[in-house]
Amino acid sequence: MGARASVLSGGKLDAWEKIRLRPGGKKKYRLKHLVWASRELERFALDPGLLETSEGCRKIIGQLQPSLQTGSEELKSLYNTIAVLYYVHQKVEVKDTKEALEKLEEEQNKGRQKTQQATAEKGVSQNYPIVQNLQGQMVHQSLSPRTLNAWVKVIEEKAFSPEVIPMFSALSEGATPQDLNTMLNTVGGHQAAMQMLKDTINEEAAEWDRLHPTQAGPIPPGQIREPRGSDIAGTTSTLQEQIQWMTGNPPVPVGEMYKRWIILGLNKIVRMYSPVGILDIRQGPKEPFRDYVDRFFKTLRAEQATQEVKGWMTDTLLVQNANPDCKTILKALGPGATLEEMMTACQGVGGPSHKARVLAEAMSQATNTAIMMQKSNFKGQRRIVKCFNCGKEGHIAKNCRAPRKKGCWKCGREGHQMKDCTERQANFLGKIWPSNKGRPGNFIQNRPEPSAPPAESFRFGEETTPSPKQEQKDEGLYPPLASLKSLFGNDP
């Protein structure tokens, strides 16, 4: 402990013990805080010996400061302790920890301002690949072969898919028109697309010349001429002129302007190489929802529309063009669902497990429906049983509690059972059937059966008058309908 406590001594230790932990608080810094700080530095793999000097404390502060936002409370307490110790070494009077932190922040801000001012006085350019050499001159660094190789590889693998545009923008950061032309000239194939790109560049250059006419008269000494459309495209300007425009005061960003023209042409080419519109992107019956979303957003990337329109397409068409299984789930989520919620809800839809689950649910519902129908049919077909012994309903003779009836249950006579009964039942007319008297009572009794078909009459247009004998015979066969005897014969 003695070695760790030897960080401060004499007047510095007295000044240390006068500083309060919090503004207006009673607790003050003690020797134990230095011992704790030494142990914490060892835990963070830092040298505790740095606490003995102000320069060492500054180095520790530089190491700890980037981790303050994500660090623990112990780390923040260690940072505060080192800040107070730094001003004790500097012999700057502070009353508490808060005042020490405010002074440290003020000192760091002044240091940043001095650094920025020195950088501005030197005139160091931020335009890469245009840099300043040791003599203070602005020089150009050509694109590296690795950058060109990456660009060519993208064109060969992706052709002109939507991801080519951000790749071109990243590789051409800070490039001059000459660098951009070098990148375009390295594209070997796709000459039809390159010709479309040239046409777009020429149109934009002509529009630039129309909006920025040439100034009349000579150019004042010490000034550079205004760039024309062909100068921006790098066809009529030298590399030195391009550097002067890009680093002048005020600068003319010819590289960025030419880059925007190229990206405009690339958008048209991407549109041509992606003939499928966003309206044609539909999810297949067995296609996973994730693959469908990938195709949807890849096509949406090539659409020439504003961000608001693309947002509407995402909210509407993504759900509308999904397959029925996913569409049911997405509609249940509601219109405010995020893409993450959609992906999670539709995960596995369309796969074998989902199909098996849907089929099992359908079969279960069909089985339940069939069981319910069978139950309902049995309920409708249930008939009322009647006891042959007592004649009451609700039970059968086997379970009847009444005294057993003697004799036949059909005719009531003893000596035989119902199955051996010879007594015939009467029909609904009260007669025993079959009858020994010929025709049943509900048939016409005296009608003669014809033995031959009737003779045909060949006298056309003549009216035949029935004979009196025939009339009497017909009256005998067909009595008046008012008599029930005509229907039932000799029935009583």
Swiss-Prot record:
One of its GO terms (biological process) is viral translational frameshifting. Residues 432-492 are annotated as: Disordered. The modification Asymmetric dimethylarginine is found at R382, R404. A motif (PTAP/PSAP motif) lies at residues 450-453. The modification Phosphoserine is found at S144. Keywords: AIDS, Capsid protein, Host cell membrane, Host cytoplasm, Host endosome, Host membrane, Host nucleus, Host-virus interaction, Lipoprotein, Membrane, Metal-binding, Methylation, Myristate, Phosphoprotein, Repeat, RNA-binding, Viral budding, Viral budding via the host ESCRT complexes, Viral nucleoprotein, Viral release from host cell, Virion, Zinc, Zinc-finger. It comes from the Viruses. A motif (Nuclear export signal) lies at residues 16-22. Residues 7-31 are annotated as: Interaction with Gp41. Late-budding domains (L domains) are short sequence motifs essential for viral particle budding. They recruit proteins of the host ESCRT machinery (Endosomal Sorting Complex Required for Transport) or ESCRT-associated proteins. p6-gag contains two L domains: a PTAP/PSAP motif, which interacts with the UEV domain of TSG101 and a LYPX(n)L motif which interacts with PDCD6IP/AIP1. This is Gag polyprotein. It comes from Human immunodeficiency virus type 1 group M subtype F1 (isolate 93BR020). The gene is gag.
